[in-house]
Amino acid sequence: SHDHYDHLDYSTIKLLKDKVSKFLAPHGIGNHLKKWGVKSNQIVELNWNESFSTENIEFHCLPSRHFSGRGPLNRNSTLWSSWAIKSPPLKIYFSGDSGYGKHLKDIGDKHGPFDISLIDCGQYNNAWKHSHMFPSEAVLAAQDLNTKVFLPIHWGVFTLAMHSWDEPARESIKYAEKVGLRYYIPEIGEIISEENFNLPINHWWERY
């Protein structure tokens, strides 16, 4: 989704580069990947509202409200994005890092409805409210996207804000239940399928 260190990790790319056929990324990220040993023919760079198809899967690079850069000298030198992934009959939305904005309704109108939406809901603060969504905004985003199941993401890993590590999960659930929005929060390492969404919610974070 963008080149911040918590989203584009050198060690992870080195482990993946010989195991995948394609890396899809926003414009400019390819330079990082090439330096780390990824071959040019493995890299597909896209601008907003461009797409790439392979077999029966479409990948749509879409707007988000964030920024990029891995240091003070290259801020906003590469693109940041969200993604829609369509493999009939399934449609998935991945927000990447993003503040709340009208782009979400635009995406929902053009590409929705979505079966599952993975939406940024952590590391929020009023000082940078345009870069990350509060849980209440993440639920609004899920509604704008016309999504069936909301998966809160971007919480419980890196500490970038002052809230407790599990507050995003607790608050997301609270707001989702208020509006009758289905949600699911998989445990770390859990493999999910559509059947999971009919199971009782496992509040696994309460064990820690």
Which sequence ranges carry the predicted segments?
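Metal-dependent catalytic neighborhoods of phosphoester/phosphodiester hydrolases
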Residues: 9-18, 160-170, 195-196
